[in-house]
């Protein structure tokens, strides 16, 4: 098989990337740091039928995206995020499910000296099973220990490595001796591209109820601003109508203007005693029901006593 020259390969790559953006409405921009070729092959197999994965050099990705901005200007949002080792996962399925599949294919890895820790590494109190000759490793890391039954025992919780720190040779050696593989590597979602909109992966964690609360909060904010500047919007129109009705009722109360909603207020102003008499009558109705209930009690007692007298 004749291998295509570099210029042809680049042209084919540009074409493929553009076609994928046209075919798929959404994709995940993923980081691929510390992902080996074998693991990448396993990820591709797991995503087969669900998503299309495309990697490439950053310079080629940027060039391909810039060349397609005329047809799809929204791709410009991706350009600032094409840094370090990245790739694309194109899909037509639910983005949250695709991310879950990527997380399922993360692999555990040892802490190599010189690597940047992707997470905190802590050691709980434990018996290490190591002999006293290994005490120097713990002393170098200032880990409090004691010898119990001929083995080294860690006394307290130890925060061995902090996220973002470089792994030292002593930390790496100790974790290897303990058989601990604290890190895991895989495709990490950095940005989500969905029909021209770019957002962070945290949005995928939001539930329907959280979205509803945020939407209602936004509607309330829009209504408040609209009312403050006297600019009617769909969110504020109900409040504007209610405020307008209150103003009209206030005008009707002190003028001869009358309409159906104002009749009760006008009647109250004309003769408040009618409403004062109605209030005790309404309160008396529940009170009148109480004696009626009490009158029924003797009847119930007589029924219970029938046939069970003291002299039967």
UniProtKB/Swiss-Prot annotation:
Residue ranges the record marks as coiled coil: none
Chain positions covered by the region annotation Disordered: 287-312
Keywords associated with the record: Phosphoprotein, Ribonucleoprotein, Ribosomal protein
Keyword Signal in annotation: no
Entry-linked Pfam families: Ribosomal_60s, Ribosomal_L10, RL10P_insert
GO CC entries: cytosolic large ribosomal subunit
SUPFAM superfamilies assigned: Ribosomal protein L10-like (SSF160369)
Modification note: Phosphorylated.
An MF annotation (GO) of this entry: structural constituent of ribosome
CDD domains, alphabetized: Ribosomal_P0_L10e
Superkingdom of source: Eukaryota
Example GO BP: ribosome biogenesis
Family stated for the protein in its record: Belongs to the universal ribosomal protein uL10 family.
Described purpose of this protein according to its UniProt entry: Ribosomal protein P0 is the functional equivalent of E.coli protein L10.
Known partners and oligomeric status: P0 forms a pentameric complex by interaction with dimers of P1 and P2.
Protein name: Large ribosomal subunit protein uL10
Species the sequence originates in: Caenorhabditis elegans
């Amino acid at each position: 098989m004749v291998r295509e020259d570099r210029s042809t390969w680049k042209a084919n790559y540009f074409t493929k990337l553009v076609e994928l953006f046209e075919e798929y409405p959404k994709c995940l921009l993923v980081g691929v740091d510390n992902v080996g070729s074998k693991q990448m092959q396993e990820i591709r197999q797991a995503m087969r039928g669900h998503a299309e994965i495309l990697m490439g050099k950053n310079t080629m990705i940027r060039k391909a995206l810039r060349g397609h901005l005329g047809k799809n200007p929204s791709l410009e949002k991706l350009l600032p995020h094409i840094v370090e080792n990245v790739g694309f996962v194109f899909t037509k399925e639910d983005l949250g499910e695709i991310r879950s599949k990527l997380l399922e294919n993360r692999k555990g890895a040892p802490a190599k000296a010189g690597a940047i820790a992707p997470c905190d590494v802590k050691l709980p109190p434990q018996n290490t099973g190591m002999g006293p000759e290994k005490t120097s490793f713990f002393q170098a890391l200032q880990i409090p220990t004691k010898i119990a039954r001929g083995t080294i025992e860690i006394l307290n919780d130890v925060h061995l490595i902090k996220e973002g720190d470089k792994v030292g040779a002593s930390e790496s050696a100790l974790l290897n001796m303990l058989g601990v593989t604290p890190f895991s590597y895989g495709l990490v979602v950095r940005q989500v591209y969905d029909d021209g909109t770019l957002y962070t992966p945290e949005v995928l964690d939001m539930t329907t109820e959280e979205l509803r609360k945020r939407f209602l909060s936004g509607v309330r904010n829009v209504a408040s601003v609209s009312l403050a500047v006297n600019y009617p919007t769909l969110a504020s129109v109900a409040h504007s109508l209610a405020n307008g009705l209150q103003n009209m009722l206030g005008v009707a109360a002190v003028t001869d203007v009358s309409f159906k909603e104002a009749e009760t207020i006008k009647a109250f102003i004309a003769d408040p005693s009618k409403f004062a008499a109605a209030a005790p009558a309404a309160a008396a109705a529940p009170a009148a029901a109480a004696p009626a209930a009490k009158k029924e009690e003797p009847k119930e007692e007589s029924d219970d006593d029938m046939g069970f007298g003291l002299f039967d």
